[in-house]
């Protein structure tokens, strides 16, 4: 058995090396250096010292739906409606093209559902953010990169998708996107536009006190534009992005509650209700970024200046169309009526920042590099309910960092520190029982803190390394959890509120990891958090409360292992295998991921849970590629303040892919959640109040087709412009900068 494992690891490295040679002839990234085109292979999964990179552009099983659906298929990632996203035990801060979205929970899910997955190039999960990343990155960063380059002198790439579900009735989903790029002697430009239409269903049961069935219609539009001007060796980049989502929810609900007895003023009686409500959400997010890249004779010396401005507005209305009430003790049926407008909420977020990043090589040990820079950011966030501004929140952050990287024989060292100063303040306003407006100050947060990071990596052999990492981070409450208003659904017995008095979370993250080639690894990490933000759901009488709280102390332990297994090791002798000409696009293999995670919270006995993910690729006749994904999380385990009664994930997805026209046209047919096993069923464990049973079911089983067509230009002398759509990334050698390669 040990020989098989060693052989598997050896083959993984051999496949990667051969892959780099074979794929350079077809799937390539193009890079211009003084008129010469250099090719670089795109890998499905790439392990680096501080991150894991998942390619979406060439993975039909990931890009055949919306972004949220693709993310949920990534091995090691857990995404739930009740506690957000985690990767290998670390809370994820979600970035889009290098800039934090600053939203979580339902607002984040809605945003990601509105983005077609075929508009994403790759996703980087940065498990060890260095000093150059804002300390507010928390445990880890998931950076969604939408930038794309067309290959083979392409000037346009079209991607389209259609799928459907059939739960009680037929529901359709479509998405389309187009990527254009061109260049003249003055400047280069890129434009990426797309739309998404999505019909879906959601059924919920909240402790048998509220049962609902929701028909959801989501409409999303986006446009990403970029201009680049070459100024000698320097470069000026101008980007403008816009994302617009309009969603409609139609909810039929019934339940049992303490209800106002309408015939008698200020009287309450038990009763059953049946209602129909319509809710409308209108979200608009705009970003503008200007970057100046100063370059020197030494290509590894870089200086970047960047100014960015983000404005995000949200409107949410819920109208009660009708309501029926049957009171008991004694029985009395009130005629059908309408409650009219139940919720009328708005929010407005504005963020402006300016940052400087500088890096250069230094002579230290066997060679090294120093990176330093600074950031100033100002955020304003206010919310309104029925015209009353009930939250006015301001944050100013000033930070600077210094990080050294050095190499000594087989060792690589990183040592850095980031200093950040926070000034957070604001006011809240509520209407009391007398109808008067009461204003209070938020709990201020005025602190200066240092955030160190350190890592060491030892190369055991070529492409096999052992690494150890530590970093201290902070996570500021997102606008989603600060918002005191309900932006989801309000029933007669449900209260959903944010908490504007939440305090920031401080993380101490430790990790040790053994990586072999780009796919195999085994690792253990622990994240210790103070004031971790968490959702609780509790019951008082017949009323349900959904709230946000700080957990004073929490630790998350995570053990994970990933291993690729080529099927030929079970059927061919080693002598024959070593003569085989490997190409991952043309061999049958399986990738196995397993992880164990345990959430330790004071005064709460949480059991750990296992995460399993298996991806299998089979090459069928006519070069048809079959990809199957199976994902499963063990039930009866603790997840923050919830116990999973059924697995958070239990899905089987299958994708069949065929390429045509010299690989310019890719057609895929797919089936997701074939056995309809995906359901969320949990029981809450609130620190105060009664436990609540919760069940929600989406129409996750869907079938569809997706296409991707790359249109070649007739002018063979035409040149592509590099990625100029807004993207901040850390280069392999360190430093945060606009991508220019």
Task: Label every model-predicted segment.
Residues 392-393, 442-445, 474-528, 546-560, ...:
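Outer-membrane beta-barrel signature, preferentially recognizing the C-terminal barrel domain
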Residues 168-199, 208-252, 280-288, 294, ...:
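Transmembrane beta-barrel wall of Gram-negative outer-membrane proteins
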Residues 24, 35, 67-70, 110-111, ...:
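N-terminal periplasmic accessory domains that precede
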Residues 423-435, 462-509, 524-542, 672-688:
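Surface-exposed extracellular loop regions of Gram-negative outer-membrane beta-barrel proteins
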Residues 224-246, 272, 277-431, 459, ...:
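Face-selective signature of the C-terminal outer-membrane beta-barrel domain
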Residues 21-60, 80-82, 89-91, 127-129:
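Short, acidic, small-residue-rich periplasmic hinge/interaction motif at the N-terminus
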Residues 68-104:
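Extracytoplasmic beta-strand/coil segments of soluble accessory domains associated
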Residues 73, 101-127, 178:
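Short acidic/polar hinge/loop motifs at secondary-structure boundaries
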